[in-house]
Amino acid sequence: MLAFTLRFIKNKRYFAILAGALVIIAGLTSQHAWSGNGLPQINGKALAALAKQHPVVVLFRHAERCDRSDNTCLSDSTGITVKGAQDARALGKAFSADIQNYNLYSSNTVRTIQSATWFSAGRSLTVDKKMMDCGSGIYASINTLLKKSQNKNIVIFTHNHCLTYIAKNKRGVKFDPDYLNALVMHAENGKLFLDGEFVPG
């Protein structure tokens, strides 16, 4: 009987610990959404709040490629599709509802230039070929753009291998971005930090 009582008390203690842990986890989950890849999800409102504290860097993968789709090409076969252009325009409109003040950059490919142009609907675009080369040097290139932008927010249209590299290098996660997926970073004291994946809405 004594052994049963002790075991019952012990089990109740474990149950209480487990219940407490679940409450903590539930609380954290309610405050922060996470992508299936392990990256925090950052919507437009959260991005705007972050931008009030630090200059933000949003790196988008280009829109749907013409040469890898059966959809109608926008123009050049090395560029994006009509659907990709429409998707970029819709995304840019939603993005600008929360972030109006930013400088726009892209790598020097037709698909990134077209994506950035349709995303911004007329905003001035600066093409930088370094946004095509993604390795350890990408951070220095981004910091250079931040300095040129006088620490304003910047939006960069680049490529899937760049986003994959940054996610792996900064957070150790596997990120396989679809068209127009994006990562959010911020600059602080000359360093770049990966905050998560941008999720419109």
Swiss-Prot record:
Signal peptide limits: 1-35
Record's keyword annotation contains Ribonucleoprotein: no
InterPro entries listed in its UniProt record: His_Pase_superF_clade-1 (IPR013078), His_PPase_superfam (IPR029033), LipoPS_heptP_Pase (IPR011310)
Protein induction: Induced by BasR.
Biological or metabolic pathway of the protein: Bacterial outer membrane biogenesis; lipopolysaccharide metabolism
Entry keywords, A to Z: Hydrolase, Periplasm, Signal
Example GO BP: lipopolysaccharide metabolic process
EC primary class: hydrolase
Top-level taxon: Bacteria
Residues forming coiled coils: none
Any one GO molecular-function label of the UniProt entry: phosphatase activity
Classification via SUPFAM superfamilies: Phosphoglycerate mutase-like
UniProt subcellular location: Periplasm
A cellular component term, taken from the record's GO annotations: periplasmic space
Keyword Hydrolase: yes
EC id: 3.1.3.-
Family: Belongs to the phosphoglycerate mutase family. Ais subfamily.
NCBIfam families: PRK15416.1 (NF011945)
Annotated function: Catalyzes the dephosphorylation of heptose(II) of the outer membrane lipopolysaccharide core. Required for iron(3+) resistance.
Protein name: Lipopolysaccharide core heptose(II)-phosphate phosphatase
Record organism: Salmonella typhimurium (strain LT2 / SGSC1412 / ATCC 700720)
Name of the gene encoding the protein in the UniProt record: ais
